[in-house]
Structure formats: structure tokens, C-alpha cells
Amino acid sequence: YFSMAVILFILFYFNRPFEGEKVAECGCMTDELERELFGHRATFIMDPCDDSNRPVPGLHTNVIRRWGVFPKSLEDLFVKAFSKQSILFPEKRVIDREWMTNIIQLRSMLAKCSFCGEETFIEPDLNNQTCIDCERAISKPMVLKIGTYRIPLFEGQKIYNVHLPIDGDINAVVRVN
């Protein structure tokens, strides 16, 4: 489960989760340092309780730009996945089902801004949201709750089979006749 979290972090943020200031300051990576920095003493670069391994401006530009763009629920899941507890105790790690549920919810929050036409995220429970591109205010939408999913309702929103407790192609759009 841990390697899945690392791969997902790289895909979303274009950076490795433990490569921050500590790795940048390392003159020569030895086997011992690698075990320390990426193993039992690893520190997540966005750990809210430990800023000793923050991304380095000019070096870790992607994660600096992208952290805060994705919804907080995804960031919270990465914080949980790379916490000291998850590193030391495998039973505390985020399992694949939790990742899948979160990413399905994430897809439901992706929308086109009604002002600039660029894609942005609309979080169903937040007030005072802005477009990540043009930074104009987005009205809080009505929300459709299906099981654990909270789907913001906006023009063009799709409900997929995966949102419903039915079998079939999970990417198929639900059609109502």
C-alpha cells in the first residue's frame, strides 16, 4: 500500500514525497543515508507537524505550486499515508479502497469554471471557493449524496455507475430515461 501512495503522490504533484530539504542538503547519497531519509526516519515534505524536510523553492517547484490546488481531502490522505505512524506501522497505511474512494470523489469535484472555462475543483462542503485559474468566486453548489460520495451539482456534472451500488462498467455515465 505504501508504494501505491508514493506513485500517486508523484502522479499528482510531480515530486517524490520524501525528497525535500534533507535530501537536497545531502552532498553524497550513501546507502546508510538513503535508508535513513527514505526509510525509518523519513519525513514527508508536507508534514503539517514537522517542517524539517520542506520542498526547496527553485528545486521542488512542482509540489510547491500544486500543493493547495487539489482538494484538502486528497492532501489529508497523503498526510495520513506518509505520517510517521504509517511509515513505522504498516497496518496504519492507507489501503487501496480508501485511495479509490477518494479519487472517485476527486473526479466528481472536477468542473469547468463558468467564468474562464478552465478546469477547477468544486468541493461540496466549502464556502468561499475560487477558481484555481482565474481566482473568481464560485458559488457553493447543491450537493447530491449517494452512499459515501458527495457530488456537487453543476452544469455538465455526470453521475457514474461507480457512484451507485450496482454492477457494470464503472466509467459508464448513468442515463435517466
Name the predicted role of every residue range:
Residues Y1-F2, I7-E75:
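Conserved C-lobe activation region of Hanks-type protein kinase-like domains
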Residues E75-K112:
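Terminal C-lobe "cap" of eukaryotic-type protein kinase domains
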Residues A111-N177:
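Intrinsically disordered, low-complexity acidic Ser/Thr-rich regulatory segments
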Residues M4-R16, Q105, N128-K140:
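C-terminal, active-site-flanking charged/polar segments
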Residues G27-T30, D96-M109, E119-L126:
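Amphipathic alpha-helical surface "interface" segments used
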Residues K22-A24, V94-I95, F115, T130:
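Composition- and surface-driven signal marking solvent-exposed, interaction-prone regions
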